[in-house]
């Protein structure tokens, strides 16, 4: 066992984030339109469905989970967590999200804004560093 404070040779790679959703089709349509994410794979289990969505820009995936026996909306607390997306055409993305009516917070001083998905999860949009 490694000693506290010593660096080990283990390498960790982030591979996915999970969001529980109420309406899988609605969520998938939102992520496709808003962020260009599409279904990578699906697992249909006993009482649940997992759909992993992603794109060619990264190997990181978002796992959308639909639990069959969870009829009420999820309590997201104060939404102090979020997933960030870097976009190559910030102005076009902002225009699309404005048209979709999903922008929930803007911080022009920092050059960023946030959108919400159908379940209330916050997603940060930041411009590519050029």
Please report, for each region that a protein language model flagged, where it lies by residue.
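N-terminal beta-strand motif that seeds the catalytic metal site of vicinal oxygen chelate
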Residues: 2-28, 80-83, 129-130
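Vicinal oxygen chelate
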Residues: 5-10, 13-22, 41-42, 51-56, 72-130, ...
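Acidic-residue sensor for enzyme active/binding pockets
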Residues: 61-63, 124
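Active-site/binding-pocket entry motifs
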Residues: 59, 68-70
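Core segments of cupin and vicinal oxygen chelate
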Residues: 11, 18-61, 114
């Amino acid at each position: 066992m490694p000693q506290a404070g010593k660096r080990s040779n283990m390498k960790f790679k982030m591979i996915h984030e999970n969001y529980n959703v109420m309406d899988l089709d609605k969520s998938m349509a939102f992520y496709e339109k808003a962020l260009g994410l599409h279904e990578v794979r699906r697992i249909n289990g006993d009482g649940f469905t997992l759909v992993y969505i992603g794109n060619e820009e990264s190997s990181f995936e978002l796992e959308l989970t639909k639990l069959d026996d969870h009829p009420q909306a999820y309590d997201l607390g104060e939404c102090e967590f979020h997933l960030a997306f870097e976009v190559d055409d910030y102005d076009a993305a902002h225009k699309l999200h404005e048209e979709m009516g999903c922008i929930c917070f803007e911080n022009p001083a920092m050059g960023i804004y946030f959108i919400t998905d159908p379940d209330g999860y916050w997603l940060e949009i930041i411009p590519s560093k050029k």
